[in-house]
Design a protein with these regions (language model features):
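Short, low-complexity, Pro/Ser/Thr/Gly-rich segments in the mature regions of secreted, periplasmic
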Residues: 301-311
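Short Ser/Thr-interspersed hydrophobic loop/turn segments at strand-loop and sheet-helix junctions
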Residues: 170-175, 183-184
């Protein structure tokens, strides 16, 4: 094994450093310099920028295989820091951005789609390591695929519900549906490149899954406690969710939605209570239920923005 490790990391080895930097490039830009990250052979795609790939590989070796150094080099480059906005001219000349004419932008992986609202809401439990956890899942799924329906899924309570998605217990015959909807591999086989789909079911998960509804309520509590003025609350909400301030038109639209939600939940207290009791975390009873439910609706909208679940 030592001989193999020395062979793989030998400066004269033509493959290891190239595969490594291509993988990191793919993580940052969405697509590797060699698009077929799983195949560097003759049947794989040719690199879009072969000289850049070779330079990064030699730089990795020169830096003694310092991954952090290479990542810092890439993210501080002018190429990475470009705006992801596209013009008709750029779209016509470089539709798939293989020429790197604009900054990278794509939907986050399934695990990050779930972790992001937990972090924004303050629910994310940041413990590192430990046993697998079992977050919310629809009732009865395991029974339907188990022998004699004896295998039951029991969700965790407390911090286990809010751990990072990488710690989620994975049953290969019944993977977590919330993450499978966002193209998480089923782990039956090794997957190097994930698919990225865009389906109506994904929007329904973000709007209705208990994880996201509960995160919206916890986020709403943060927003309300931030400031007493709606304008400042909305600014804080946008900064937290999408790392920018709202445009005037966005502010007006969300303000109208907030007013409508306040009116609805004031008239329908049962609907407000039903919304606020989703999930296991404790509800802040110092906030009036109708007000909290209205801001929960606003928080849910912000957490469902394409901008929120996409890498900017």
């Amino acid at each position: 094994r030592l001989d193999m490790a020395r062979w793989l990391t030998d400066p004269a080895h033509p493959l290891t450093a190239r595969v490594a930097v291509n993988r990191w490039w793919e993580m940052l830009f969405g697509t590797g310099l060699v698009e077929t990250a799983e195949d560097f052979g003759v049947q794989g795609a040719r690199p879009s920028h072969p000289e850049l790939l070779d330079w990064l590989a030699t730089e990795l070796i020169r830096q003694k295989w310092d991954q952090r150094g290479i990542l810092k080099l890439i993210v501080l480059s002018a190429t990475y820091r470009q705006s992801s906005n596209v013009t008709p001219q750029l779209l016509d000349a470089d539709p798939r951005n293989r020429l790197l004419s604009r900054g990278p932008r794509w939907r986050l992986p399934a695990e990050m789609v779930r972790d992001n609202p937990l972090a924004v809401s303050g629910l994310l439990h940041r413990q590192i390591g430990g046993p697998s956890v079992r977050p919310y899942q629809p009732a009865g799924l395991w029974e339907d695929v188990s022998v004699e329906r004896r295998d039951k899924y029991v969700a965790d309570s407390g911090p286990g519900l809010y751990r990072r998605s990488m710690y989620t217990f994975w049953k290969r015959t019944c993977p977590p549906p919330g993450m499978a909807t966002f193209d998480a591999p089923d782990r039956e086989t090794c997957v190097i490149r994930r698919a990225r789909t865009n389906t109506p079911l994904q929007a329904l998960v973000l709007l209705n899954d208990p994880t996201y509804v509960e995160a919206a309520r916890a986020f709403a509590e943060r927003i309300i406690h931030h400031n007493a003025a709606d304008t400042e609350r909305l600014k804080f909400a946008f900064r937290s969710a999408v790392a920018r301030l709202p445009a005037d038109a966005e502010h007006a639209v969300v303000n109208d939605l907030l007013a409508a939600a306040r009116k609805r939940f004031t008239a329908q207290p049962d609907a407000a209570n039903k919304l606020l009791t989703v999930g296991s975390s404790k509800v802040d009873t110092t906030i009036e239920a109708g007000e909290l439910a209205a801001w929960t609706s606003v928080a849910s909208i912000l957490l469902n923005l394409d901008e929120t679940i996409s890498k900017p």
